[in-house]
Amino acid sequence: RGTPAGCTSRAVVRAVARGGVIRFDCGPRPVRILMTATAKVVNARGRRVVLDGGGRVTLSGAGKRRILYMNTCDPAQRFTTPTCQNQDHPRLTVQNLTLADGNATGQRQEGGGGGAIFVRGGRFKVVNSRFVRNRRTSAGRPSGC
């Protein structure tokens, strides 16, 4: 059985970059993980990324940063097809998780976007999750979460 001490921002960032199914094992009580960096999906690492908080995990941007980022057109996250706009992967699923206090204000890439999650391309699905006190940028389209 895991403990809250093992559930860190660094562990989340590494797990998201690796891809696959990520099930948090932080013990029996609710836990808040303060993200010290944005977790970025690496497009070429796998077709599926699932974050499952089991209903007990909150990822917090601490009012300082975006929590999750997936962009099929960002060369730093590696292209997997000649036309990044039409890519059907990766498939990011956020389930049984709370994303709180994410902040994208001041972000300029791709017109800003959501405070909790930025998604361009691929597929994105939310299941039984909450978004609380996230701040999107005022630039660009009025979208994002």
Task: Show the residue positions of the predicted features.
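Acidic Gly/Asp/Thr-rich repetitive segments characteristic of extracellular carbohydrate-active
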Residues: 1-23
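Extracellular beta-strand-rich solenoid/capping regions of secreted or surface-exposed proteins
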Residues: 13, 18, 34-50, 58-95, ...
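N-terminal carbohydrate-binding/catalytic regions of secreted carbohydrate-active enzymes
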Residues: 26-34
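Outer-membrane beta-barrel translocator domains and adjoining extracellular loop/strand segments
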Residues: 109-110, 139-142
